[in-house]
């Protein structure tokens, strides 16, 4: 079996859940499977993460930390790397160039699933940085929140990272989802932290696609082949 290297810590709870999802998926194939997994927890400060998520600032410092993690995973024996953070994929090309092993792309894996499902209008729930850098705009017809709601999503994601006001944030996020879902035939949780608030598979009759689950599925498949 191959070894996967996870660039984690963005945020820690999401990384832990992603890790367990990979194990669960591998054990569905074979109950005795215990996949080989390395995790490099990115030592990023909340201040730097918030600055990048909200304002796309601090790119140089953020990229340096991600590249260090990628190189450490390669040195540790990883056969390929995954990053369970959509926003970090702003740097996917630089990360790929920094190592000599494959790096799975959460954006590409998600696009494959959405195209297979023939989703025509996809409601996008993501960080301001993901929206600003148009990570999902290629080949997907997106329905984006209005400016105010997008700012609220940024605040909600920061609160998730700080473990603050969880119940209140869920209610606020559901209101935003209700607005977006009226124009969508699919909803995309394009921030891996959002699944901590929205575990549902459908909301208002609209199917919810979780990018973290999609990447976990692609990771397990690669581990087992």
Annotated model-derived regions:
Residues 1-225:
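Non-catalytic structural scaffold of enzyme domains
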